[in-house]
Amino acid sequence: EITLEEIEKKITPKTKIISITHLSNVTGAIIPIKEITQLAHSKGIVVVVDGCQGAPHLKLDMQNLDCDFYAISCHKMYGPTGLGVLYGKKKWLEELPPYQGGGGMINEVKKDRISYGDLPNKYEAGTMATAQVIAFDQSIKFLESIGIENVMKHEAELIEYGQELLKKNNSVKLIGNPKKKGGVLSFTIEGVHPHDIATILDEDGVAIRAGHHCCQILHEKLNIPASARASVGIYNTKEDFDKLNASINKCKKIFNLK
């Protein structure tokens, strides 16, 4: 869990940017982005938020969060792969240079100079991934039809159920216990590598993620080689956690654990 006090201790006169996740994809901790942004802006620091895990699971109000940039991965919102969204404040998007050149993003090209198109064209070089964009539009409408409040309520109930279930399972250790938690539940089994856990569970039709989850430094701090992660979505049920628990017991039996 990351607190405002911890962030403040890390800030030095050299700090220019705070880059932080909105929802940890290991512990599920929901980070207080609004408060961190207020602190950062009071010191002239830019805030960049990794919202890939936050966007599908949390209600977003960018004016309220007030961060400078917020990145989203579309496939985590039941959309297509190969597509992302970057929200940015207009003043920064106008000031920063484009990272890539190509058709559609320039205004005028001369031998000795170049001028770029207006936003958002300036950052969208070349042929757009039209099919993916159209598909993602439908994904957003799908989520809106359900209601993000309903998504959050459903996932919170599932995570609470899963936590209580796995807490009772000997040899299973849950990773992190944040006060505010999203739809992620990571764990380890004493004496069993997470890759072996995932393989055995896969044989039972239980799909989890095993590894560092793009967070090697966090795992190093936790002094574990990796972790197994169960993530919930709108399609999951409590019965899925029952099946997960049964498969974990099968895994323990294979490794002669009680």
Predicted features by range, described:
Residues 1-258:
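Pyridoxal 5′-phosphate
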